[in-house]
């Protein structure tokens, strides 16, 4: 009788354990997709019109504390105002065919690069899937050189997993 009860306890424990729901919510008017974990904000994939590149902002810990800085998107008392191209979290490179995609600061900030700046323009949300413990967002972006020509198309899948 001891073994069946132990097995039953294990099965019940596994059935009661549940992974957090990871939900993607598109806000077309704001040009962003919010990532929620059990209904609480984790981050947003943002692709605002005046942005030089799509990014994740802000990033939060599991307890909800924001750990990315606000500058240059917003002013936060006591926060440093250097490196205006360090806008939350993003993926790109510093030199693609002689164009700098890394150091592209927002309009009005000084240029640090001797190379021309490129832009990464969000084109489309290709797929969104929310679920228990994991969500995925597939997007497409064009990398645009300073002369306006497209150097590459980037299709990427961002995967968000909830801690167990």
Explain the meaning of each model-derived region.
Residues 9-19:
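Hydrophobic h-region of N-terminal signal peptides that target proteins for export
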Residues 18-30, 41-42, 116-127, 155:
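Short small/polar-residue motifs
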Residues 20-84:
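Beta-strand-rich N-terminal accessory domains
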Residues 1-8:
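Bacterial N-terminal signal peptides that target proteins for export
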Residues 3, 15, 59-60, 66-68, ...:
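Short, intrinsically disordered/low-complexity patches at protein termini
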Residues 82-163:
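Extended, loop-rich substrate-binding clefts of extracytoplasmic carbohydrate-active enzymes
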């Amino acid at each position: 009788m001891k073994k069946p009860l132990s097995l039953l306890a294990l099965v019940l424990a596994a059935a009661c354990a549940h992974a957090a729901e990871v939900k993607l919510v598109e806000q077309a008017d704001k040009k962003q997709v919010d990532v929620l974990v059990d209904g609480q904000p984790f981050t947003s994939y943002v692709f605002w019109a005046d942005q030089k590149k799509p990014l994740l902002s802000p990033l939060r810990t599991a307890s909800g504390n924001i750990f990315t800085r606000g500058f240059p998107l917003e002013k936060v008392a006591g926060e440093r105002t250097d490196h205006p191209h360090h806008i939350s979290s993003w993926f790109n490179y510093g030199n693609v065919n002689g164009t700098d995609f890394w150091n592209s600061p927002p309009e009005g900030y000084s240029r640090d690069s001797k190379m021309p700046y490129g832009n990464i323009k969000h084109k489309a949300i290709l797929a969104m899937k929310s679920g228990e413990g994991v969500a995925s967002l597939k997007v497409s972006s064009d990398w645009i050189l300073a002369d306006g020509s497209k150097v590459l198309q980037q299709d990427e899948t961002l995967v968000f997993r909830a801690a167990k």
